[in-house]
């Protein structure tokens, strides 16, 4: 994943707060083959928070704050979870199995 942009930053000022948009994108690195999901499924709310990136940008601008946007799908790995949580890499989302997340080894999880 070294050639994959994992984050985007925005610097709109020095307000004493920080905007973090953890589910800003539904992107999956090519090497993960869309986790075995059709593109239209990745484009739904299970792959990301639709509109969250635009909202984060607008908030950052209005509040004159710095912002950080995650540029990968929460289905790849959820940046809003602790490393020890079982749902860090979800097996399913809204009862839809995620084929690329089934039967992962400890090494697979560590790679992400």
Question: What do the PLM-derived regions correspond to, one by one?
Answer:
Residues 1-112:
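N-terminal catalytic or cofactor-binding beta/alpha core of small enzyme domains
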């Amino acid at each position: 994943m070294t050639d994959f942009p994992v984050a985007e930053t925005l610097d709109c000022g020095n307000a004493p707060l920080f905007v973090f948009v953890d589910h800003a994108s539904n992107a999956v690195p090519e090497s993960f083959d869309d986790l075995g999901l059709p593109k239209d499924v990745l484009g739904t709310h299970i792959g990301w928070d639709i509109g969250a990136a635009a909202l984060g940008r607008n908030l950052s601008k209005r509040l004159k704050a710095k912002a950080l946007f995650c540029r990968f799908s929460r289905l790849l790995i959820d940046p809003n979870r602790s490393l020890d949580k079982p749902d860090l890499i979800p097996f399913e989302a809204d009862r839809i199995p995620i084929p690329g997340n089934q039967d992962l080894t400890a090494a697979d999880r560590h790679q992400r």
